[in-house]
From Swiss-Prot:
Organism for this UniProt entry: Danio rerio (Zebrafish)
Ranges of residues in domain PDZ: 515-593
Role: Binds specifically to GTP-Rho.
Name assigned to this protein: Rhophilin-2
Signal peptide: none
Domain BRO1 as annotated: residue spans: 111-460
Record key words, sorted: Coiled coil, Cytoplasm
Pfam families registered for this protein in UniProt: BRO1, HR1, PDZ
Localization: Cytoplasm
Family (UniProt): Belongs to the RHPN family.
UniProt region (Disordered), positions on chain: 649-683
Record InterPro entries: BRO1_dom (IPR004328), BRO1_sf (IPR038499), HR1_rho-bd (IPR011072), HR1_rpt_sf (IPR036274), PDZ (IPR001478), PDZ_sf (IPR036034), Rhophilin-2_HR1 (IPR049603), RHPN1_2 (IPR047138)
Any one of the GO BP annotations: negative regulation of stress fiber assembly
Length: 683
């Protein structure tokens, strides 16, 4: 999507400035990426409609005993299931449309796979937040209408982020605001009437919750998806572009890892632990592929040691994609992974393995062991290439015997040719792969190069002794690792900071209504002292002073002096306001903290229920854009996905989420974060 801006006087979509924020892309811009997102939104609505029809038909089938009605319902169910299948195939096609995300100047690089952004429905924060501000903070919610509008505009902008670091900063900004919002408005003792609806990016199934953790998890997924799109868009014909692509994919992997480790019970397939593990492997594999391209970009010298090194590097790329492919075909997620993705990973396994065999064959066929060469060094390099030497021969025998070098080199060429042919067959099996002309050209050029090499070394009168070339041990000098996103540099200001310091004025704390007390000095004495940071507390209260008689209590928080709000003032600033009090005195406002331990825990609302419908929210069946206010609906209460962590009493509960008010959580050092992409480190 082009980085067009919403015409509102904002020039870019960076951090908050002067109390406002910058915008995302123009949602009406008709670009390739925006068209795909619009199609995804339309498909999601069609899937909802078919799911409602199927749920209604299944309920009718259970309720009726009339055979004629049952036959009609069964027939209708078959139509609905057929329509659902078609819609799922269309959604899979959107996830397979990777060509619009590639760099327009790419002409010799294999396309990469980006993640699509999750779609969501609009959320109206206005009424619930104003009600909560009035009930909980005893302030007029209308005074915060501008801040609420800013929050809603910020969320709307995050639905169409620009495909660059500014778009990432925009999502990171909103994610931090969500942490502020959670602390200020989402109380464990009561439900707030805000429902978040998000659609699964692979199945299109909606999930609806009134838990802000679903919103935070979905924003992290979109941040990882945006990083993957940035990496896909990079110009891989330049070193700078390859560095950008590597960094973007590694940052995407880091965000996915944080999402997987933090939000452990998300009720949608695309954010399940198994799916996130696969996506994380995919991002690291693509980062490693870019590292390989970075090595090959200046050109590969036709030199013995260089060719063996490149063979092991190519084998390493194939190995990483083999791990990705294995995770794609595992039972929990294989039915939801696009066929394009599995075939693309299989194709890259064959392609890079074939490249590895081609490099080894070139090293053996084009070079001979000369007296001036370092014999020990070549012997060591060749011995490290295989687990077991071909036909039990020693490395030195192969290096010194010209015929043996030629025979083993041709065997590697044969494996290279077979691998390239298999890659082309894999390419022909998937209609979405067939649309990628660049990929087809690369595969055929690689095959022709191996065939030409084989013809140059094939003699008509030569007796062909067929042998199978051994596998090549993978090895790399540069390893793809998860990288901390640069979005940690975004400075965020709490939109609702006027409510007071978060450490005191939060949703989990309860106070009395503000009390107005007339403060009159006696012999220039207040009758009490102040302590603490903002807001200050009353201490050492003289029970005989006029303030105590007016209702002031020990431990009260001073929130206003006269018409001046002093929630954010320290002791020295408040004393400056009180030192000039005349004989008539001045009004002060105080609040007293109440014991909240006796408050009952709020019941979690339903999130999803059963079957293909295991990711489908029953709330979504009763709500849509054109429906009435959700408050008028009655929904059966069930534990949310976060309550599973409490039920099982696990130490790593999803309720213990990091607070992003000072720094991004994925930037914090943690023993749980491994920098290795090996299975033992990540999974």
């Amino acid at each position: 999507m082009t980085d067009t801006l919403i015409p509102n006087g904002c020039k870019s979509n960076g951090p908050v400035e002067n109390g406002y924020f910058k915008k995302g892309c123009n949602p009406f811009a008709q670009t390739g990426r925006s068209k795909l997102q619009n199609k995804r939104a339309v498909l999601n609505q069609k899937i909802i409609k078919q799911m409602r029809m199927r749920a209604g038909a299944e309920n009718l089938l259970k309720a009726t005993s009339n055979n004629k009605v049952r036959e009609q319902v069964v027939l209708e169910l078959s139509y609905v299931n057929s329509d659902l299948q078609l819609l799922m195939e269309q959604l899979e096609g959107l996830n397979s449309s990777v060509e619009v995300y590639q760099n327009v100047q790419e002409s010799s690089s294999i396309p990469l796979i980006p993640l699509g952004l999750k779609e969501t429905k609009d959320v109206d924060f206005s009424v619930p937040l104003k009600d909560f501000i009035l009930e909980h903070y005893s302030e007029d919610g209308s005074n915060f209408q501008n801040q609420i509008d800013d929050l809603m505009d910020l969320r709307q902008a995050c639905r169409t982020p620009s495909r660059n670091n500014s778009g990432v900063d925009l999502i990171a900004n909103y994610f931090s605001q969500l942490s502020f919002l959670e602390t200020r408005f989402f109380s464990p003792t009561r439900q707030i009437g805000i429902f978040f609806t998000w659609y699964d990016s692979f199945t299109g199934m909606p999930v609806c919750q009134n838990n802000i953790s679903l919103e935070k998890a979905s924003m992290l997924f979109n941040m990882a998806a945006l990083y993957s799109q940035i990496g896909t868009r990079a110009d891989r014909q330049t070193l700078a572009g390859l560095e950008d692509a590597i960094a973007a994919f590694q940052k995407s992997a880091r965000v996915l890892h944080f999402l997987k480790e933090t939000f452990t019970h998300t009720p949608s397939y695309d954010m399940s632990p198994a799916m996130l593990s696969m996506l994380l492997r995919l991002m690291l594999a693509q980062a490693h592929e870019c590292l390989f391209e970075q090595i090959t970009l200046p050109g590969i010298r036709n030199e013995f040691f260089c060719l063996l090194k490149m063979a092991q590097e190519a084998a390493k790329v194939a190995e990483t994609y083999a791990q990705v492919h294995q995770s794609m075909i595992e039972t929990p997620i294989t039915k939801n992974v696009p066929f394009f993705w599995t075939t693309m990973s299989q194709l890259k396994i064959n392609h890079y393995n074939s490249l590895a065999h081609y490099f080894v064959s070139t090293a053996l066929l084009d070079h001979q062991l000369n007296p001036s060469d370092d014999e020990d060094k070549q012997e060591k390099a060749l011995s490290q290439l295989y687990d077991a030497m071909p036909e039990g021969r020693s490395p030195l025998d192969i290096l010194k015997n010209k015929d043996e070098r030629r025979r083993i080199g041709k065997a590697h060429l044969q494996r290279s040719i077979m691998g390239h042919e298999e890659a082309i067959r894999t390419h022909c099996r998937c209609r979405h792969l067939q649309k990628l002309d660049i990929l087809s050209d690369i595969l055929r050029a690689s095959l022709n190069r191996s065939l030409t090499k084989f013809e140059q070394n094939d003699k008509e009168d030569e007796f062909t002794d067929y042998m199978l070339a051994p596998d090549i041990i993978s090895k790399t000098e540069k390893k793809a690792e998860m990288e901390i996103p640069a979005a940690t540099k975004v400075k965020v200001t709490d939109l609702f900071q006027r409510l007071g310091p978060l450490s005191v004025f939060s949703a989990k704390q309860r106070w009395t209504a503000p009390r107005t007390i007339r403060l009159i000095l006696q012999d220039r004495d207040l009758g009490f002292t102040l302590k603490g940071d903002a807001p200050v507390q009353i201490q050492s209260l003289d029970p005989l002073c006029p303030a105590a008689a007016g209702g002031l209590k020990e431990g009260d928080y001073l929130v206003a002096v006269g018409d001046t709000d002093c929630k954010w003032m320290g002791v020295s600033d408040v004393m400056k306001l009180l030192k000039d009090v005349d004989e008539e005195g001045i009004n002060i406002r105080v609040v007293s903290m109440m014991d909240s331990s006796s408050q009952p825990m709020a019941t979690k609302s339903a999130t999803y229920c059963g079957g293909l419908s295991k990711t489908y929210s029953m709330i979504c069946l009763a709500h849509d854009e054109d429906d009435k206010n959700p408050k008028s609906r009655k929904v059966a209460k069930k534990p949310s996905f976060l309550s599973f962590g409490l039920k099982n009493k696990k130490s790593s509960s999803t309720l213990s989420l990091p607070n992003a008010d000072y720094s991004r959580p994925w930037n914090r050092p943690s023993a749980n974060y491994s920098n290795s992409h090996h299975e033992s480190g990540l999974y």
